[in-house]
Amino acid sequence: MRINFYLFLILIVFISCSNENQIYEISVSSESEIFNKESKVSLDIKLNNFLIKVEDLKFFINEKKVSKVTNLSIAKLGSNSIKAQFTHNNQKKILIKNIDVYNTDQPNLYSYEIIGEYPHDISLYTQGLEFKNNILYESTGLNGYSSLRKFDVYNNQLIDVRFLDDEYFGEGLTILNNKIYQLTWKNRIGFIYDLKTMNMEKSFNYGQSSEGWGLANDGNNLYKSDGTEKIWIIDPVTLKEIDNIEIVTDKKKVKNINELEIVDEKIYANTYQFNKDVVLVINKLTGSVDGIIDFGNLRNKVKQHNNLDVLNGIAFNKKRNSFFITGKRWDKIFEVKIIKN
């Protein structure tokens, strides 16, 4: 009897261990190594790396039901969630697998033409730049030096300035509905100012976004970068993050998205991704990188000094149909026309 009891215990342990070692996963196979919206994929279930047959199998991509063989045209660019529901050995299972979907086309290469140069305070650690009524507004960074500035760039005249408390590191800014929105870097807080008086009215906290980098608007919502591959869409009234897009090329996600400007449904964003002064032209709806502008030569045209830093200011002037570009501790602002090659 004692031997049978021990055999029974061994059997229980064996069954338990067998169940613990059962690793289910979703298999996603395709002819292409990199998924894009034209990819056709086959979805299956694997158990311990072997394909198996299951019952009541259903697949979903971002909660939309799909067939086992499906086209990724319904997917969004960036991260996508694949869910499987099925029954195996009389047990109901739910699995989740994330895949990345990239842009179908390579980015176009853009060039630029310098059509003007203007003085810029060489001491300013520029973090954000935007025009309103032909007046340039600038946000600057560094703890103890961060500020919000109102500037007549054509006459080299500082009109007004507001300084942040020393604990705050200023970042991007944008202007919408007669309000100035300004970010801070790691404090996870932003500030709202009255456009006319430049007096601070209130602050707001970040949601899921990790940090504050760049800020822009499309006339309806705010668009905020946080140093990752994501740009967050924010309701300007509730200040809640309502959605996000992920920035991708045909091969990779692009992180370190920084200063932003939105023109004609395109987001112009500078990035440190390529270790040079580059601005990406991004589809505002999908996150695809449609173009790349290499501004690397601009830094050679400003005064060279030990504290000279990267390009980090881009503002569009609607009246002149041109962009104004500067950088951290640059002594010039460049007016440029962007040319699609």
What residue spans do the PLM features occupy?
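Conserved beta-strand positions in repeat-built beta-propeller and related beta-rich domains
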Residues: E138-L142, Q182-N187, K224-T228, A269-F274, ...
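Beta-strand-rich domains and repeat architectures in extracellular enzymes and scaffolds
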Residues: I115-S147, V161-T174, G327-R329
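Short loop/turn segments that connect beta-strands within beta-propeller blades
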Residues: F151-N156, D194-M198, D235-L239, N283-G287, ...
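A short beta-strand motif characteristic of beta-propeller blades
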Residues: E113-P119, Q157-L164, N199-N205, D243-K252, ...
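A short helix->beta-strand "capping" segment at the edge of beta-propeller domains
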Residues: Y102-S123, V153-I159
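Edge beta-strands of extracellular beta-sandwich domains
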Residues: K68-T70, Q91-N103
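C-terminal motif of bacterial Sec signal peptides marking the signal peptidase cleavage site
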Residues: V13-S16
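Beta-rich, blade/repeat-based domains predominating
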Residues: I122-N133, D166-N177, G207-G219, K251-E265, ...
